[in-house]
A protein has these predicted regions:
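N-terminal small/polar-rich segments of proteins
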Residues: 22-142, 154-157, 161-208
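C-terminal charged interaction modules
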Residues: 143-151
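Gram-negative bacterial Sec-dependent N-terminal signal peptides
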Residues: 1-21
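A periodicity- and composition-biased signal for non-globular, repetitive helical segments
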Residues: 8-9, 145, 184
Length: 208
């Protein structure tokens, strides 16, 4: 019985020494503890808007930090292009028939990390339209950084579905210049409104 107890005690001493072998040692001048590092990595996406730099004048993109995320104010506008607005204007080629287009450049910066592919697109859609029937959101038809030369360079931005305005294959972290505007039609009668109006455009970055 005594022999069994002695063997057990020695065994426990050996286990204790092994437990601390990495952090302390005797009869040596080096010790090598180990540290296991753990982290849960997630993929991430970001799409930011900012004031443009390409056109002659720019309507400021204001970061609200909430809902809506950004705002842009075109100022006072009219269908004949009498008011200058806050940025750029293409007056109607045929007043009383064609719309006046007030427009501005803006920048989009997509950033994505940890994705299994770099294929991506950016879309835009009017998700809340103007109440006024004589006002609509327009975008540059070319989807490029080239400054539009006339009203003909603009087309109505989609309301029922989103329009692709960049991609596929946009580079992460690179700002893109695009153009957006408000078209004021020379209409009269029911549904034609004046005064302050607003619409909401939703931009979507998809990496797939």
């Amino acid at each position: 019985m005594k022999k069994y107890l002695m063997t057990f005690a020695l065994g426990m001493m050996a286990l204790s020494t092994a437990a601390f072998a990495g952090t302390q040692a005797t009869n040596t001048n080096t010790v090598s503890p180990t540290l296991q590092i753990s982290a849960t990595i997630q993929k991430a996406v970001r799409l930011t808007l900012s004031t443009g730099t390409a056109a002659v004048t720019h309507c400021a993109v204001v970061n609200n930090g909430g809902n809506p995320d950004y705002t842009m104010n075109f100022g006072t506008v009219d269908a004949l292009g009498i008011n200058a607005g806050n940025c750029n204007l293409f007056g109607p080629a045929n007043p009383g028939v064609d719309s006046a287009i007030y427009w501005s450049d803006y920048n989009l910066t997509p950033i994505f990390t940890g994705q299994s592919t770099s294929n991506n697109t950016i879309t835009a859609q009017v998700t809340t339209n103007f109440t006024a029937a004589n006002a609509s959101i327009v975008r540059d038809s070319a989807n490029s950084s080239t400054v539009p030369a006339s009203a003909a360079a603009f087309t109505a931005l989609g309301t029922a579905s989103a329009d692709t305005i960049a991609g596929p294959g946009v580079t992460s972290g690179t700002a893109l210049t695009r153009f957006i505007g408000v078209a004021i039609a020379p209409t009269n009668g029911a549904g034609t409104l004046t005064g302050a109006q607003s619409a909401t455009v939703t931009f979507t970055l998809t990496v797939n």
